[in-house]
């Protein structure tokens, strides 16, 4: 997809809430990716990120180990950002479903 962000100073505006949320996700991914470079997480690093940063959306009893094992392409026990994004998408779906049930 590439980078589409404007490099022009006059185009620089305050980021929207969604843009800030995406930047926060990326920063958190990089903060937890210690072993083997900033572009991947080990299953252990992903587990730490999820348990520390998403304790209410993905509590420890939500089958986290199985979800991690089933994520994307787990080559050499390294998970790329896309796999993390899959997990975030799953968490977002559960919030949407929960809100829909509560709204009924």
From Swiss-Prot:
Keyword list, A-Z: Apoptosis, Cytoplasm
Biological process annotations from GO: apoptotic process; defense response to bacterium; positive regulation of granulocyte chemotaxis; positive regulation of monocyte chemotaxis; response to lipopolysaccharide; toll-like receptor 4 signaling pathway
Keyword hit for Amino-acid biosynthesis: no
Gene Ontology CC terms, in alphabetical order: extracellular space; perinuclear region of cytoplasm
Superkingdom to which the source organism belongs: Eukaryota
Ranges where the EF-hand domain occurs: 27-61
Bilayer-spanning residue ranges: none
Subcellular location: Cytoplasm
Keyword Transmembrane helix: no
Gene Ontology MF terms in the entry: calcium ion binding; calcium-dependent protein binding; chemokine receptor binding
Quaternary structure (record): Homodimer. Interacts with AGER.
Protein's job: Modulates P53/TP53 protein levels, and thereby plays a role in the regulation of cell survival and apoptosis. Depending on the context, it can promote cell proliferation or apoptosis. Plays a role in the regulation of cell migration by modulating the levels of MMP2, a matrix protease that is under transcriptional control of P53/TP53. Does not bind calcium.
Name of this protein: Protein S100-A14
Organism: Bos taurus (Bovine)
Gene name as annotated: S100A14
């Amino acid at each position: 997809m590439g980078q589409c962000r404007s490099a022009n100073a006059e185009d620089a505006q305050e980021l929207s809430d969604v843009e800030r949320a995406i930047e926060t996700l990326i920063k958190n991914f990089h903060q937890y990716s210690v072993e083997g470079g900033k572009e991947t997480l080990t299953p252990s690093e992903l587990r730490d990120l999820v348990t520390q940063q998403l304790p209410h959306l993905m509590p420890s009893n939500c089958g986290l180990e199985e979800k991690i094992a089933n994520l994307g392409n787990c080559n050499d026990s390294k998970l790329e950002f896309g796999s993390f994004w899959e997990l975030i998408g799953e968490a977002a779906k559960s919030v949407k479903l929960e809100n829909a049930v509560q709204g009924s």
